[in-house]
């Protein structure tokens, strides 16, 4: 690896955490050399038989051949499964408990259907547009329907010379795309048409998620990546992106019937707590899995995810106790999610104390996000997608630029500048907010013109479980 001393390969210590200690130019050179999936060389043995004296060249080529570690493969498959657990059943139960009993199945169905749809779209064209080469803003169609992706092709990790089977990377990233779309549905729950959810999800995934993912994560060509933006596991790509889309949806779909006049309460906080717990467990795959290797970098992301979430849960509960006189279970569960969201962009580059600080700050501020800020915005964001994911993602993305500093325990390079990195992070946040906002407005307008957005008032009052899906969660 350029600019880094050689390490004992048996220790596998040259991991993703180390990658972020390099200068931006060095990071670009490494990724340029190893970014494209490669077929394993098959002609070396043939050449050795045909060309006398080829042994030395064969040894040199073998030494430079990409390494696939079975432990990494096992870890990444497990991480992929954990992200699936986050969505179904984690997110589904978290959202399902927050809505009224007459709408719980509709939310579960929306989460399941959106995740399933986007995973299929990811294989069809999403993967190639996000990671299949290309310029600053979008990829190419070179890998349409996974063209050229086989058991032999490899995807690079953050460590020079260490790779994963490309199928593993495709599967892992598909779950990220799927859960991002599913997050959005909470903002306009209890009043939107099912077919409108699916059409919007397809449009938004294509024109918002894929360009942002490419700009932030595809190196060295991605525009925000080239600027030096740090988003280890999806603070901008996933959470700000989804939060803004949810807020736009809350405005354009409109308020629920009776909002502000009738009591609209969660029907089962126990479901929500179970969902939050599953999200916390699954998030270790989301964050630590983003290291792409089972090394010390994954361990750091794992520990930071644990600490930030615990700090956020307590911070939310403390603020709630001060403001309302007592902490609530719903608040504790919401604090868990706020902490998970905020540490997502920073989990691989900040130290444990920085993670605690990020979690505590996010937990406290997101209480305001779902109360005071929500009143200021005057939007019926039913399940507080923007207040938790949007605001939490913004807090985490910005604080990544602070706590990555080595002086604060982070893994940044020796010449790391907080002021410079904070500016880059702010740019990344701004681009994501504007891009997702504009695409979301256009997508909702298209959906409204094609299939309509809302169910009829009578159907909404009866509940979407019966009127949209013909079934009820609770039989009387």
Features from the language model and the residues they span:
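N-terminal secretory/membrane targeting signals
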Residues: 19-59
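N-terminal basic, low-structured, amphipathic or hydrophobic segments
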Residues: 7-9, 20
């Amino acid at each position: 690896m350029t600019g880094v001393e050689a390490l004992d390969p048996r220790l596998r210590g040259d991991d993703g955490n180390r990658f972020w200690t390099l200068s931006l130019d060095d990071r670009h050179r490494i990724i340029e050399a190893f970014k494209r999936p490669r077929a394993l060389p098959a002609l070396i043995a043939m050449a050795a038989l045909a060309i006398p004296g080829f042994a030395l060249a064969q040894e040199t080529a073998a030494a430079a051949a990409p390494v696939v570690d079975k432990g990494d493969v096992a870890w990444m498959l497990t991480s992929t499964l954990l992200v699936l657990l986050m969505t179904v059943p984690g997110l589904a139960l978290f959202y399902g408990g927050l809505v009224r009993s007459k709408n719980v199945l509709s939310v579960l169905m929306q989460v399941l259907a959106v995740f399933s749809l986007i995973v299929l779209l990811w294989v069809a064209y999403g993967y190639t547009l996000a990671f299949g080469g290309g310029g600053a803003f979008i990829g190419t169609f070179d890998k349409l329907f996974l063209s050229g992706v086989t058991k032999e092709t490899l995807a690079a990790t953050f460590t020079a010379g260490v790779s994963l089977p490309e199928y593993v990377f495709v599967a892992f990233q598909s779950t990220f795309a799927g859960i991002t779309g599913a997050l959005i549905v909470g903002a306009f729950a209890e009043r939107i048409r099912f077919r409108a959810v699916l059409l919007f999800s397809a449009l938004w995934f294509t024109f918002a998620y894929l360009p942002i993912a490419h700009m932030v994560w595809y190196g060295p060509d991605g525009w925000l990546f080239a600027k030096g933006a740090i988003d280890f596991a999806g603070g901008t790509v996933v959470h700000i992106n989804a939060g803004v889309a949810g807020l736009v949806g809350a405005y354009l779909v409109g308020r629920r019937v009776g909002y502000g006049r009738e009591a609209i309460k969660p029907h089962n906080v126990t479901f929500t707590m179970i969902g939050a717990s599953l999200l916390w467990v699954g998030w270790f795959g989301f964050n630590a899995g983003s290291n792409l290797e089972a090394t010390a970098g994954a361990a750091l992301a794992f520990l930071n995810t644990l600490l930030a979430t615990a700090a956020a849960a307590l911070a939310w509960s403390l603020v709630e106790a001060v403001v309302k006189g007592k902490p609530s279970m719903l608040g504790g569960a919401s604090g868990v999610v706020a902490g998970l969201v905020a540490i997502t962009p920073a989990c691989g580059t900040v130290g444990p104390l920085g993670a605690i600080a990020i979690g505590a700050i996010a937990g406290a501020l997101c209480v305001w996000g779902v109360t005071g800020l929500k009143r200021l915005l005057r939007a019926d964001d039913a399940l507080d997608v923007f207040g938790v994911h949007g605001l939490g993602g913004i807090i985490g993305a910005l604080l990544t630029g602070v706590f990555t500093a080595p002086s604060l325990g982070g893994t940044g390079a020796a010449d790391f500048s907080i002021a410079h990195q904070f500016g880059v992070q702010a740019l990344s946040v701004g681009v994501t907010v504007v891009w997702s906002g504009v695409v979301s407005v256009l997508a909702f307008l298209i959906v409204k013109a094609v299939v309509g957005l809302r169910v009829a008032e009578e159907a909404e009052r009866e509940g979407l479980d019966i009127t949209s899906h013909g079934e009820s969660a609770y039989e009387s």
